[in-house]
C-alpha cells in the first residue's frame, strides 16, 4: 500500500492576469486549489478524508508572490510508496493512471474509490470511479456518480470516459457470481467485475455507503439532484467497442443459475457446508490482492472434485463474509484493537473506536494520518527470519501509554494475521501473566484468522520462558528477603484468561479488578500443582481431613469432648493451621496480617502442639482413674483441664510457657 497526495487545481485559462487586487485573486485561487490523498493498493485507489483544504487555503493566502496554478501542479504531488508485493514499474503505472483519471474530473469533484476491473481484451484497462462533489452550499456529498474509464494499455498517456451512472435512491447492488456484481439505478443496469477479492470488497463497501446516502437524501430523477452528472454525460468519448463493453457485459454475465429442486434442499445444504469449510482453507493460503473470484471457485472445484458453477453467487457471498471478518478490527482487550491496513486507513472507524495510538507492525504500510494519531512503527516483513522479540518491550510500553490515557490503540500489519497478532500475544503474556496457549486461545476466539508464522511462534515460546524466569526470580527475591509473596506466585503457574472477554463493556479499572480475582482464584482450588512454600504445604494438610475440621469448629463450645475422642491425636496437628493462615493473610480467621513464619518455625510449632495434646490426654486419663469419690482433686483438676485445652486450641495465649 502507498500514500499519494495529489494537488488539485483548475485548468489554466488563457487570460494573462486577473483583473482586480492581487489578494482577491489569491483568495479565489486558494478556494479552488486543494489536495486530496489516496491509499493506493494493487487494483484499487481509496480516497482518504484529508483535512488539508483549509491549511492549503491559509498557506495560499499568506504567500502573495506565489505563481498562478497550472495543470503542471497536478504532477507535483507527494508520494510515499512502501516496498510491497508490486514491482516499482507497476506502482508507477498505477500512480500515472491516478493522475490521468483525476484530470477527467472537475476541480470540485472527488474520487472516493477507483477500482480496476477485468477487461475482456487484455491490452485494455478499465477502472470504475466512485465520484462525489463539493460544489455549492446546497449540494451535499450524498450525491454520487459512477464513472467508467478506459485505457488503451497500461502505458497509455491518456484515458477516456465510457460510462456515467448516477446513483439514485432506488439503486440496488446484486452479486452475480465469479466476483461480478451488478448495479441498477434509474432503470439502468451495469455489471462490474473487479480484478481481485480485496478490490471487490472495498468497492462494495463504498457502494453500500453511497446507496444508503442516496436513499436517505431521497434522490429521484427529474429533480435538481445530480444535475452535475450531465457534465460527464456530454464527455463520453471512449471508442464504440469500449462503450459496447460497458453496456453488453450485463447481458453476458447477468444470467442466474436455475433454481434448485424442492427435493434437493438437504443435499444443497450439505454442499454449502462443504464449500464453507474448504473456502476458509483456500482463502487462508491465497493472496486476496491478486487472486480472482473465479480462481477461488476453480480451487474449490479441485478440492471437492465437483463443478460449482451453480454455486457462484453463494461462493461470492461467503467470501465477502470472510473478507469482512478480516477487514473488521477485532477488540481483543478493552483498550486494544487488532486489525489490518484497511482499519488503519479508515478514519471514521478509528474515531468511532476512540483510537489515539496506532502501532504499525508492517514494513510495507504507511502511516496514513500522522497529524491525527500517535504512531509507533516496527518495520519488518512477514518472514520467519524476522526478529520481533527485541521490539516487544517497546510495543508493550506504547500500548500501556494509550491505556494510561484512557484511550484505545490499534495494532495492525497488512492483514492482522501474523506480525500484529504475535505482538498482541506478547503483550497479553506480559501484561496479564498468562501462558502462550492461554493468550493464543483468547486472541483466536475474538479474531479466528490470527495465526503468527512459525518463526514468530518460536519467538513467543522463547519470550514465555523469559517472562517465567523473570517472575521466578522475583518470587525468590521476596522469599530471601522474608517478605510474603501473597498473590504473586499464583499467576506464575497459571492465570485464567477467560475473565477478560466481559471487560470491553467497562474500563481499565474493571480490568484490574478482574485480573486480581483471576489471580486469587487458583488459591481456592484444592491443591493443583502444589508450590514449594508454606502456603501450599498447609493447604495440602488442611485438605486431608476436611470433615474433621468442620467438627472441630462446631464443637468449640464443648472443650472436654475434643480430647475424649479417639481421633484427638489426628485433630491436634490441624490446630496450628488457623494461626498460620492468619499470619499469611488467609481467610479462616480474620485477625489481620502478621509477619510470615518460616518453614522451620512452623514445623516446631506443629511438634509442640502435638506434645501438648498428648500430655494433656495422658493427664486427663490419670485424673479420671483416681476415682469418683474424691471431690477436691476433681475440682482442682477441672480448671487445669480447661486451661490446658485453651492453650492447645487457641494457640496464641501462652503456649511457649506451657511447653
UniProtKB/Swiss-Prot annotation:
Q: What is this protein called?
A: Protein phosphatase Slingshot homolog 3
Reaction it catalyzes:
O-phospho-L-tyrosyl-[protein] + H2O = L-tyrosyl-[protein] + phosphate; O-phospho-L-seryl-[protein] + H2O = L-seryl-[protein] + phosphate; O-phospho-L-threonyl-[protein] + H2O = L-threonyl-[protein] + phosphate
For the biological process aspect of GO, one term held by this record is: negative regulation of actin filament polymerization
Q: Which residues form the DEK-C domain?
A: 269-324
Q: Could you say which protein family the record assigns here?
A: Belongs to the protein-tyrosine phosphatase family.
Q: Which Pfam families match?
A: DEK_C (PF08766), DSPc (PF00782), PH_SSH1-like_1st (PF23040)
Alphabetized, the UniProt keywords read: Acetylation, Cytoplasm, Cytoskeleton, Hydrolase, Nucleus, Phosphoprotein, Protein phosphatase
Role of this protein: Protein phosphatase which may play a role in the regulation of actin filament dynamics. Can dephosphorylate and activate the actin binding/depolymerizing factor cofilin, which subsequently binds to actin filaments and stimulates their disassembly.
